[in-house]
Amino acid sequence: MTERNIAIEAANRDAVEDQRVEIVERKGIGHPDSICDGIAETVSRALSQLYLDRVGHVLHYNTDETQLVAGESIPDFDGGEVVEPIYILIVGRATKKYNGQRLPVDSTAVSAARTYLRENIPALTLGTDVIVDVRLGQGSGDLKDVFGENNVEIPMANDTSFGVGHAPLTETEKIVQAVEMQLNGPYADNHPVIGPDIKVMGKRENNSIDITVAAAMIDRYVADLEDYADAIENIRAFVTDVAHRHTNREVTVAVNTADDYDTGSIYLTVTGTSAEMGDDGSVGRGNRANGLITPNRPMSMEATSGKNPVNHIGKIYNLLSTDIAESVVADVDGIRDLQIRLLSQIGRPIDEPHIADAKIVTESNVNLQAIEPEIRAIIDNRLADVTSITERVINDELTTF
């Protein structure tokens, strides 16, 4: 056991599962904020791979300021058109020259972004429905120094910041996550009428769970208002079934609640994303590192996507804290609710946080002191293995939104 500063104490609150009101949100992969997160992270991995291939190690960069400016569209039954394209600007810092070698950073970034859009928002036509641009400046000199060289075994923190994570997920969290992933997975495969811009909001009040879904419907697959209404009802029934796989509580599902059938005002799109019709996007405005927005729990405001995976605390500590929480809950019996907070200090090795704080709600028959040594050992071991987070991120084994 090392001398890392690890604090473990009982949480002075009820477990989130036992609180009267719980709110959970997830923005789907086609939401404008998620599009920015996805592009930023895809570009990040592409740049990491470029640097590894060309110079043998990851150089200083960040792409976590990527922005989306919404377009304008005229959706219509059986197919409308985009009249003003979506504009996506990949923004950040990157090392473009190393030891006299010029590196194709901008072209790598644009290529990665276009590939991501083709794979995840297939109804978008590149060049006409969406334009991808890039502005990557040089990095700050002092931060490049903190970033260090390839022979540094444990990188130094690039910032004084923190990351948070929790486990296990509540029933409401599981439902919200599963609903979006199922709609944007198997359901969309069989029902192309639903676009990837899906937002799911869950509200639990005591033992009643309300799920509200906003789903962008693709106009070319909708013949008329009756056809649209049938598609919405199919989604509602599917979501209800998914929710009941995760809870025995009462569940109510509503889909596209702003629709007004009397006036014909419905959530119809050309491409399956609200980005085509006035909804802008930014990195870090959507899901946290575990894929959820959870106002009942502490959250970091850091944008995880697009940050450098070597020493950027806003990425590493948010992913690591979640990994620690999940590892502890998986290996230690009797934990009902666990919150992990990791705080860095700029220039300090990332495996030695300023503090690693664990707040725990145990089952009623479990004494925290009895399980504390096991919890401490897991936290210490995961911190010692912090550099594995970098490899897992580059290999696309960890999601950031």
Curated annotation (Swiss-Prot):
<dbReference type="GO" id="GO:0005524">
    <property type="term" value="F:ATP binding"/>
</dbReference>
<keyword id="KW-0547">Nucleotide-binding</keyword>
<keyword id="KW-0554">One-carbon metabolism</keyword>
<keyword id="KW-0460">Magnesium</keyword>
<feature type="binding site">
    <location>
        <begin position="137"/>
        <end position="142"/>
    </location>
    <ligand>
        <name>ATP</name>
    </ligand>
</feature>
<keyword id="KW-0067">ATP-binding</keyword>
<dbReference type="InterPro" id="IPR027790">
    <property type="entry name" value="AdoMet_synthase_2_family"/>
</dbReference>
<comment type="similarity">
    <text>Belongs to the AdoMet synthase 2 family.</text>
</comment>
<dbReference type="InterPro" id="IPR042544">
    <property type="entry name" value="AdoMet_synthase_3"/>
</dbReference>
<dbReference type="GO" id="GO:0006730">
    <property type="term" value="P:one-carbon metabolic process"/>
</dbReference>
<keyword id="KW-0808">Transferase</keyword>
<dbReference type="InterPro" id="IPR002795">
    <property type="entry name" value="S-AdoMet_synthetase_arc"/>
</dbReference>
<protein>
    <recommendedName>
        <fullName>S-adenosylmethionine synthase</fullName>
        <ecNumber>2.5.1.6</ecNumber>
    </recommendedName>
</protein>
<comment type="pathway">
    <text>Amino-acid biosynthesis; S-adenosyl-L-methionine biosynthesis; S-adenosyl-L-methionine from L-methionine: step 1/1.</text>
</comment>
<dbReference type="GO" id="GO:0000287">
    <property type="term" value="F:magnesium ion binding"/>
</dbReference>
<dbReference type="Pfam" id="PF01941">
    <property type="entry name" value="AdoMet_Synthase"/>
</dbReference>
<comment type="function">
    <text>Catalyzes the formation of S-adenosylmethionine from methionine and ATP.</text>
</comment>
<dbReference type="GO" id="GO:0004478">
    <property type="term" value="F:methionine adenosyltransferase activity"/>
</dbReference>
<dbReference type="GO" id="GO:0006556">
    <property type="term" value="P:S-adenosylmethionine biosynthetic process"/>
</dbReference>
